[in-house]
Every structure is written in structure tokens, then in C-alpha cells.
Amino acid sequence: MIAELAGVSVTTVSRVLASGADERGRWAGPETVAAILEIAERSGYRRNPHAASLRTSRSDLVGVLVPRLQDFVLATVYEGIDEAATERDVSTFVTNSLDRPELQRARTRSMLDRRVDGMIFGDAHLDDPLLDELAEEGVPFVLVSRRRGDHVAITCDDVAGGRLAAEHLIAQGRTRPAVLSGMAYASTAVDRTRGFLEAYAEAGMPLPPERVIHRGFDAAAGREATEAVLRDGPVPDALFATNDFAAIGGMGALRDAGLSVPDDVALVGYNDTPLAASGSIALTSVRSPVHRMGRLALESLLAIVDGRGAESRLLAPELVARASTGPHPG
């Protein structure tokens, strides 16, 4: 980051970059100012009018960035955000990043150019520095659904959720599971998988790495991941998918392979979307309080904008058992 490379505080960097040429000397010596400007230029920094505008005015506008609003979970998160915003006479607008860092960056800058009071990100990547850069610039923001570093985040306790799925399958006698893990850049995939693996390891049944398959979160990716599991190793007696849609795709792949759910393979999803309960074989799923996450994210952001500050929140998951994890035969 600019402050680290220049050897000064984030506050000094923020003041120098926010000031005009004739005012920068108030905050640092000429050599330090020159170093900050040079590093900022090399890193592609664009001056953000946002932080300065917050000192004098409020737009009562919040920007929201999600991977795909057509995703039921993200749509429900946004519903909670917008509901809480309406109650506080704040407007929101939302845009998709498609989980592409370059698009996330461009659309973030576009929102900031519109002088939003702050931003809510539902598309945080564990390996992308954008959020650290925004924090250095003094931009108020909150993460929702996903976490990154020590930034304020409103999430489900996904490690606990993964454990719930594992404990349920262990109680059903399932000893050879595989995991449809999602993408490694998303904390939801990482944390849910971690909780699941920890619970199985503690039960004396550690999973080999090849039993954890990283693919996307939609049904097509779930089908592809399940086909890889069936092709590359022995048939598992259980599948844990870190997303309901991936689980439903996995169910289709199992059916096409002539395997029965739950007799041959038990199946657990995550988020408990309405689709989980409506299929021909109702899906056991870990319920995540996504609507409440959205409300709390908006409330937390406004607290930060108002100078009151906010802390990260972990909301409790709940396992909803259905037909896809019926009793293990024998």
C-alpha cells in the first residue's frame, strides 16, 4: 500500500492526496510529498472526491456491489439492505461485478464518482487489494456475506455452518464424503469447507485433498464438480456443496450416473434457498440468515458514516434436515 511503501501513516497519505499542490506541505515535507505522489502514480491511484465531500455534505446514497443480482442469495441480501435503507430515508443502487476484480474496481470507482456516502460489498475476494486501498483512502464501506482481512463484515458463521453439515452426515453414518467447495477466492467457500473438514478430521475421518473440488457456485459447476468426483475416485457416500445451486447440479449428476439420493449418496447444500425444499428430493441445507445480513450491513455502514463506528458480526447458521440425507442403509 502507499503508506507502507512511503513509510508514513495512512492519515498522512490521505491528507497529502486529498490536498491541492499548495497545501500538501502542511502535512509532510517536500521529499515525503514527492515520494507519496510518485508511489500513487505508479500504483494507478485516482484522486477520490468522496472523502472530502463527506466532510461537508451527505448524498444519502449507498452503493452496493454484488457478483450477480440474479442469484437468489444475493438478491435477498440486497432486499435486506434496501429495506433498511428505505426506513432511514437512504437510497441505494446496486450493480454486478460478475466476480471479476477488474470490473469490481471499475464499478467501485464509478460509484464513488457519484458521491455515494459509502459502499457495501458482497463480492469481496480474499486475494484482491482493492478493499485495502479504499480503507487507505478513507472510503466508508462494509462487507456482507463474504469477509476479507479485518474489514468490517456482516457474515454467517460459515465455519460453524460447515461443521453443522459434517456433524449431521457423521451422525447418519456417512464416512466417505466429498466437498463441492466453490471458488477459493470467496471466504464463503473457504470457511464452509474448513468447518466441514475440521469436523470430519476430529471424528477420525480426515478427507484427502482430492476429495475437495473447487468449482463455481451455480448448478452447472456443481454438476461438473460431481462428475469429477465420480470420475477420479471411489464413489463417495455423501456430498457437501457450499451452495444450494451447486448441490442441485450435483444431484443431477448423481442421478445420471445411476446413483440414488440419499440411499447411495447423501447430499447437503448451503443457504436453504426456496428451491431446496421444492425439488422431487428435498435438499438438506444449512440455513444462512441472508436477509438479516443485508439489514445489518446497511445499519453498520451508516454507523461508520456517522462516525460511530461498527464491528464485524457473525450470525448463527441452522441446519435444516430433509430427505436428501435420509438414514444410511444398514
Model-found features: residue ranges?
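Short, well-structured alpha-helical segments in soluble
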Residues: R105-R115, A220-P234
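Short beta-strand segments enriched in small/hydrophobic residues
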Residues: L5, V10-R15, L54-L69, H168, ...
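Alpha-helical recognition/docking segments in bacterial nutrient-uptake
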Residues: P49, T56-E167, A171
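N-terminal helix-turn-helix DNA-binding module of bacterial transcription factors
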Residues: M1-S57, P329
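Hinge/beta->alpha junction and helix N-cap segments in small-molecule ligand-binding domains
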Residues: P49, V66-T76, V94-L103, D128-P129, ...
